[in-house]
Amino acid sequence: MRILGIETSCDETGIAIYDDEKGLLAHKLYSQIKLHADYGGVVPELASRDHVKKTIPLIKEALKEANLTAKDIDGVAYTAGPGLVGALLVGATIGRSLAYAWGVPAVPVHHMEGHLLAPMLEDNPPPFPFVAVLVSGGHSMMVEVKGIGEYKILGESIDDAAGEAFDKTAKLMGLDYPGGPLLSKLAEKGTPGRFKFPRPMTNVPGLDMSFSGLKTFTANTIAANGDDEQTRADIAYAFEEAVCATLAIKCKRALEQTGMKRIVIAGGVSANRRLRAELEKLAHKVGGDVYYPRTEFCTDNGAMIAYAGMQRLKNNEVSDLAVEARPRWPIDQLTPVMK
């Protein structure tokens, strides 16, 4: 079975073709970073228009890369949510229309389930069950995962997601867009221990998180200490340290609560090297393992959607002619895939 995956939930157009026997046959990605850079963030209308321009050409490129034609595709998977509604509608409309024209089934895919399953694309995929640390620009949550579709949210951010906090703090520090990766790069030059940032909500029970207050703490630290280059690097170091330590503390609680020892990190922030190191250290302490996708599959991509869609199609989950786009869609509302 070969599945075409379409991802257009935000500011990346991702197209991929996945074969259940041969694996990933094609993977195309177009980032809109330059388009939104002047605005300091994603402009939804511009994102939607750009998806309209890029999706079909990228599908043609993917088919060519895989040496396939439309007749070789057995199903189309598209991101139906959560995300920007206009951007979602572009991918959903194109995906549903192509499936109808080609006479194959279409399946709407949950964006965060795609991220959660991205490590399954690797040579050493994680076995179930595990605790998933889903961290991106729009979501931060701890999820108990017993199987595909068997998700229980253990805790989530009550305000800014981790990736959002990175980007907003970077903007506060005068870094270019997208600021998260630039802040991490600046943090590499920082002096450990010069500043100590709080670990939000770690002194209270539970697994919910909060990252918005770290922006204010950053602003106050800059105001009190100036913003010369080394001070900026030291502040970036302390900020990143606080976010990663907070996630590690919450993950440790999740492991204790569930009795699990396997950790999966997924989402855009899963590319952060310090976060990986913190969770690898945690896994080592509990005698467990940590899994994460290769860097190119940490950000939004079509490969994860194609893979997740294949699992859903094998479960006979086929959409009707309606075009689905759900800007809000809790991951624990998904149905389990029958084993």
From Swiss-Prot:
Binds 1 Fe(2+) ion per subunit. GO terms for biological process: tRNA threonylcarbamoyladenosine modification. Fe cation binds at residues 111, 115, 300. Its cofactor is Fe(2+). It is found in: Cytoplasm. Its main location: cytoplasm. One of its GO terms (molecular function) is N(6)-L-threonylcarbamoyladenine synthase activity. InterPro entries: ATPase_NBD (IPR043129), Gcp-like_dom (IPR000905), KAE1/TsaD (IPR017861), Peptidase_M22_CS (IPR017860), TsaD (IPR022450). It is an enzyme of class 2 (transferase). Belongs to the KAE1 / TsaD family. This is tRNA N6-adenosine threonylcarbamoyltransferase. It comes from Vibrio vulnificus (strain YJ016).
